[in-house]
């Protein structure tokens, strides 16, 4: 049996402001830093250790990983930073308040943009300053692979090459792997691992800063998965994530 640990970054400044974030590189709040420290403490107390970690190229995930490493005394851990683990790109919604957007377009439309599998939000214009083309962190990524908007289907297609070419081989080799990423890049991976249908994935909500443990068989098929921590608090956090895109 293999174990894989996933963690969504701690609360970011735009999580706190209920704004669509996507590829915008916002930082953690004080609460987000505390969530990351607590995640590291939970993992340490439960006896976990790691051989390698994967994260995105966005600071809220990177800093979450730092805090987990710090609390676990694993600052030496090899880390792979990949744009493929970035949050889903929210296109022209990037920076908008979710509740205000729902009030303007309706709860149902915003739910489709946030959680449906194959309907992306309106795209950014290529000349928009939020477009990734001139960002140095993507200088080595072919321009045609850089998104101006994404649906979850696009995010799955972006994440899976990293899983197949690097993460899965690391797990199979016996390495203890930690992935610190984002709500939708983790939803994309979980959809693949658990075989969740395109319709059912709408209901999957991942709380900030809570370790999610996957136990996998020899074929890397899930045996079971579970969150570490106070289960009632985790359920409340998941419900709060689900409510973020509603007008009222």
Swiss-Prot record:
Record field: catalytic activity: (2R)-2-phosphoglycerate = (2R)-3-phosphoglycerate
Residues involved in substrate binding: 8-15, 21-22, 60, 87-90, 98, 114-115, 183-184
Gene Ontology biological-process entries: gluconeogenesis; glycolytic process
Pathway in which the depicted protein is active: Carbohydrate degradation; glycolysis; pyruvate from D-glyceraldehyde 3-phosphate: step 3/5
Active site: 9, 87
Keyword check for Membrane: no
MF GO annotations: phosphoglycerate mutase activity
EC code(s) of this entry: 5.4.2.11
Site residues by UniProt (Transition state stabilizer): 182
InterPro entries: His_Pase_superF_clade-1, His_PPase_superfam, PG/BPGM_mutase_AS, Phosphogly_mut1
UniProtKB keywords: Gluconeogenesis, Glycolysis, Isomerase
Biological role: Catalyzes the interconversion of 2-phosphoglycerate and 3-phosphoglycerate.
Family as reported in the entry's similarity comment: Belongs to the phosphoglycerate mutase family. BPG-dependent PGAM subfamily.
The protein's assembly and partners: Homodimer.
HAMAP family: PGAM_GpmA (MF_01039)
Protein name, per record: 2,3-bisphosphoglycerate-dependent phosphoglycerate mutase
Species lineage: Bacteria, Pseudomonadati, Pseudomonadota, Betaproteobacteria, Burkholderiales
Name of the gene: gpmA
